[in-house]
Amino acid sequence: MKKAIIVIIVAIIALIIILNSKNILKLIYKTNYSEYVEKYAQENDIDPLLIYAIIKAESNFNELAESNRGACGLMQLMDSTAREVATNTAIEYETGNTLYNPEKNIALGVKYFADLKSQLKYT
């Protein structure tokens, strides 16, 4: 009887976690840039949680992050990549501090990711 109660409690907890997984993940990831992530993820049909994960891995949510190779900002974009993405879209880009602008960085980074996804025909 005691074992059955424990199994039921564990099952209920697991069900709660599964049903609230997006909310739990949003608690784990900082969502300081949620306005931009949600907007550009939706525009490009990308799961916003994937974008949060990329930002976490690339810059740990530090908008001033810079790699030793020159990748900049939240999504760690190279100037050449950002320029290429911007020329194929309506996103304005100027070489310099643009990659440190969270909205521009996320807009360009999400679009770049969406383009890669499309090239690989991954849905």
Model-predicted regions and their roles:
Residues 35-38, 42, 79-123:
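Alpha-helical segment that forms one wall of the substrate-binding/catalytic cleft
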Residues 49-52, 72, 107, 111:
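Active-site phosphate/pyrophosphate-handling residues
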Residues 61-64, 71, 84-86, 109:
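Membrane-proximal soluble helical/coiled-coil segments
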